[in-house]
Amino acid sequence: MNSIVNFSQQLIQNFQEVSQRTAADSSNLKAFAYLGAGLAMIGVIGVGAGQGYAAGKACDAIARNPEAQKQVFRVLVIGTAISETSSIYALLVALILIFVG
């Protein structure tokens, strides 16, 4: 247990030293903000691929059973809206990092 406490204290100390060094150089801070924004937008790739896959499966389901079109479409729209929220949050984080950070 003592080693975990020592490790966490060393980790916090290292983070403080790094933050003090990077805060002294604002160009590094802006570069890290752009890097973080780019990394935040990587999550959007998975959302786009997942939505495309879901839309394809919905088209397959409607082609197999045209009478269930309304129910499949309703579930597709709800699922798309739910999965789109993560990409909107990623975009929001990226914009905050670029313009505020």
Swiss-Prot record:
GO molecular function: lipid binding; proton-transporting ATP synthase activity, rotational mechanism
Residues spanning the membrane: 31-51, 81-101
Record carries keyword ATP-binding: no
PROSITE patterns in the record: ATPASE_C
Keywords recorded for this protein, A-Z: ATP synthesis, Cell membrane, CF(0), Hydrogen ion transport, Ion transport, Lipid-binding, Membrane, Transmembrane, Transmembrane helix, Transport
Superkingdom of this protein's organism: Bacteria
Leader sequence segment: none
Membrane topology: Multi-pass membrane protein
One matching Pfam family: ATP-synt_C
Subcellular localization: Cell membrane
InterPro entries, sorted: ATP_synth_csu_bac/chlpt, ATP_synth_F0_csu, ATP_synth_F0_csu_DDCD_BS, ATPase_proteolipid_c-like_dom, F/V-ATP_Csub_sf
Residue numbers marked as site, Reversibly protonated during proton transport: 84
Gene Ontology cellular component terms for the protein in this record: plasma membrane; proton-transporting ATP synthase complex; proton-transporting two-sector ATPase complex, proton-transporting domain
Subunit structure: F-type ATPases have 2 components, F(1) - the catalytic core - and F(0) - the membrane proton channel. F(1) has five subunits: alpha(3), beta(3), gamma(1), delta(1), epsilon(1). F(0) has three main subunits: a(1), b(2) and c(10-14). The alpha and beta chains form an alternating ring which encloses part of the gamma chain. F(1) is attached to F(0) by a central stalk formed by the gamma and epsilon chains, while a peripheral stalk is formed by the delta and b chains.
HAMAP family hit by this protein: ATP_synth_c_bact
Functional summary from the UniProt entry: F(1)F(0) ATP synthase produces ATP from ADP in the presence of a proton or sodium gradient. F-type ATPases consist of two structural domains, F(1) containing the extramembraneous catalytic core and F(0) containing the membrane proton channel, linked together by a central stalk and a peripheral stalk. During catalysis, ATP synthesis in the catalytic domain of F(1) is coupled via a rotary mechanism of the central stalk subunits to proton translocation. Key component of the F(0) channel; it plays a direct role in translocation across the membrane. A homomeric c-ring of between 10-14 subunits forms the central stalk rotor element with the F(1) delta and epsilon subunits.
Family: Belongs to the ATPase C chain family.
Name of this chain's protein: ATP synthase subunit c
UniProt source species: Mesomycoplasma hyopneumoniae (strain J / ATCC 25934 / NCTC 10110)
